[in-house]
Structures are given as C-alpha cells and as structure tokens.
A protein has these predicted regions:
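Pyridoxal 5′-phosphate
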Residues: 1-243
C-alpha cells in the first residue's frame, strides 16, 4: 500500500476472485523493494513506476500474461502498433508491440536498465535477485528503526494502518493537534526534508480512516538511520511548537 506500507497476500486475494476477473496488481511500492515472481502471484497484469527504483520519471512498466496480450486491445493506436493498413481498416500487431504506440521513452528505458545494473552490484554474486535481497534487508533495518522512533511519539502522532514488520519503508501519519497539511509540509521543506502530504491518490482509504489526508515519509536504499534521526528531530520540534 502506498499509504500504509503494508504488504498484502496476493495469492489470498486471487483465491477470492471470480475466475473471469482481470487481476491487475499495482506494484509501484513493491517491485522496487523486494523480488516478485509474476507467475507465482497469479496476476493477469503487473504495473510499476520506474522512478521508484532509481530510474527517471515518466516511465511505467506493464507486464502481461501472454494470453492477456492476445485478448486485450490497445488504448491508443499509433506508429508501431499497426501491422498493416488499408483505406477501409487496419490490422494490429499480434504481440506486445500493439501496446507500444509512438516513440517510446528511450531515455527512461535506458535509465531503468542502468538502475537494474546498479542493483546487481549490491550483491556479492552480482545478480538482480541478490541485489533486491540487499535492498530488502537494508529497508527492514530502516523500518524497525522508524517504528521504534514513532512509538516514542504515539501521544502526538497517529500512524495509519497496522504497524507490522511485514511492510515497506513508507509511513503515513497525522499529528493529533495539527490538521493543516500545508503547514506541516512547509515546515519539513524548510528543514530540507521532503515528505508528501495529501490523499496520495488513495482517497477511499483515507475516508475509511475518517481522514482528509495524511503526511507520508518514505525511505529507500539511499537513506540511512542518520537521515531518519534528522526527520524525527524535526518532527519533535514541530510537535513542541504546537504546545
């Protein structure tokens, strides 16, 4: 979840779906953090954003089952998607090319390739799976450290979702005595700390928690416990100013 950071049991979700249901998984918060076996999770499609794993922005990746590639039609028909055309009609490409209309984001694709090559260097065996495992282990250290620090502020800060160890390193929170998200965001910006405040494209979930929005702090491979110390020092200072 891009709000709670929790990791869901996709196989369990899949088992509760009707056979004809198209099962699409948004892996933007999971693919950058740990290895996913697309065939194992039983999804029809998996999407993720490349910039969340250190590539450039404006690049999305769509993984489809072969059968779904045959069944689905493209949203946009443009250069590269057409196999043949006449005055009266056209024939689409039969493979994944029918979904790749126009000039692709070449720079973005190259940046993702280099990001993946860098991730390989994180493991002694120089493999992608080993690099992803290194990211996961580092992130779990940050998760434990972050939860421990938030526990000390429980009377002033509310974390959203179940705070379990099975999660990625993003944390959405609200201050119990401050609902002005712009003020919170501006305060952290003044400390050169980047957080996001708002609905995070998940308004129904926020309504479930009876909240108009939350502030979200995220950590990744390039963050350290020293970075987290700076965040919590600033958060504590903000809480003091409210009193």
């Amino acid at each position: 979840s891009n709000v709670t950071g929790n990791i869901y049991d996709l196989k369990k979700i899949k088992s509760r779906l009707r056979k004809e249901t198209f099962f699409l998984v948004d892996g933007s918060q999971s693919v950058p953090n740990f290895s996913i076996d697309f065939q194992d999770i039983g999804a029809d499609a998996l999407v993720f954003t490349a910039h969340k794993m250190m590539a450039q922005t404006w690049l999305w990746v769509l993984v489809l089952k072969n059968q779904r590639i045959k069944e689905l039609s493209p949203l946009i028909v443009w250069g590269g998607t057409i196999k043949d055309a006449t005055i009266s009609g056209f024939d689409l490409q039969k493979n994944n090319q029918k979904f790749e209309a126009g000039t692709p984001n070449i720079i973005g694709a190259v940046s993702l390739l280099h990001a993946l090559e860098f991730i390989k260097t994180l493991s002694p065996e120089q493999t992608l799976s080993g690099g992803m495992q290194a990211i996961w282990q580092h992130e779990q250290e940050l998760v434990r450290y972050t939860l421990k620090n938030f526990e000390q502020l429980w009377n002033a800060v509310q974390l959203i979702g179940s705070q379990t160890a099975r999660r990625v390193a993003l944390f959405s929170f609200v201050l119990r005595d401050e609902q002005n998200f712009n003020r919170i965001w501006e305060f952290f910006a003044e400390q050169n700390i980047c957080i996001r405040c708002g609905g995070h494209c998940a308004y129904p979930l926020h309504k479930h928690y009876h909240l108009g929005g939350t502030c979200r702090m995220s950590a990744y491979l390039y963050n350290t416990t020293e970075d987290l110390d700076r965040f919590f020092t600033s958060l504590s200072e903000l809480i003091k100013r409210q009193r």
